[in-house]
Amino acid sequence: MDGRVAIVTGVSSGIGNATARALVGRGYRVFGTARSAATVLPAGTERVLLDVRDEASIEAGVAEVLARAGRIDLLVNNAGGSVVGAVEETSLEQARDLFDVNFFGAMRMTQAVLPAMRAQRSGRIVFISSLLGFLPAPFAGLYSASKHALEGLAESLDHETRTLGIRAALVEPGFMRTNFDSNATLAANLVGDYQQARDHSRENFRKNTEGAEDPQVVAEAVVEAATAAKPRPRYPVGKRSGLVAGLRRYLPAAVFDGVFRKQFDLDFTGAPALPRTGGGRTAKPSTGERGAKVA
């Protein structure tokens, strides 16, 4: 892949860090986005100062990559964050901030690189989604909603640009060994009725991530999505992630609903326990300016 140029957002840790290293290892010239000049980047990665929430920043960053490298072959939309709490507990400001990063950040980046890719008549855009992009997520409902939106965007984009030589693909990690939960923002308007369930849910999430796989497995899926002659629309990643994806898509809705509620203990007075799917979202986000944590 010598000569190929990639942009990866959110490379300071987790999936973004592993992805940048994997692409460098495959011969890509990798530009990693960072909001600060002090951010430590993976070895072999070139820094581009860029904030996915800021259109002017993105335009300047993409222009810099084109000036330095002359082309863009791959965009990995990885930067993201999360808010932990029930839907009722999450403020509208937090919801807007989260969508501004997880959804609109990826959309801004995508729109910024597409003119160059169209001119080349080639390119690949990989979206880091999550199993929660097509599963319900008690106490991470806004995160799940942002990933559901991202999945719709990515699939639509792939159909729009395919005849132009540009492909889009989704990588859907399960639970991974990252700092994702510890860096999540807590919902702003906590309600006592949810406390036991919320706390227990977070504890189960932490237990699942402690025994989960390394983000390197996600990086390998990104490389496959980036280099395959005929990329798949989706790449579930993690222990049993493919099985969970299949159950979600092929079981009757009422049957899946019952299985899901049983796995989460949602019909009991006690707190729900996250299902042990080997999945979840990754990428260590850093503190955002307002409500969400961003990478």
For every predicted segment, state its role.
Residues 5, 12-13:
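Conserved glycine-rich cofactor-binding loop
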Residues 44-56:
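Rossmann-fold cofactor-recognition segment
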Residues 64-77, 83:
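A glycine-rich helix->loop->beta "capping" turn
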Residues 86-87, 94-96:
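Substrate-binding pocket helix/loop in short-chain dehydrogenase/reductase
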Residues 110, 146:
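Active-site helix of classical SDR
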Residues 130:
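Residue(s) in the substrate-gating loop at a strand-loop-helix junction
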Residues 162-210:
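C-terminal beta-strand-loop-alpha-helix "lid" module of Rossmann-like NAD(P)-dependent dehydrogenases
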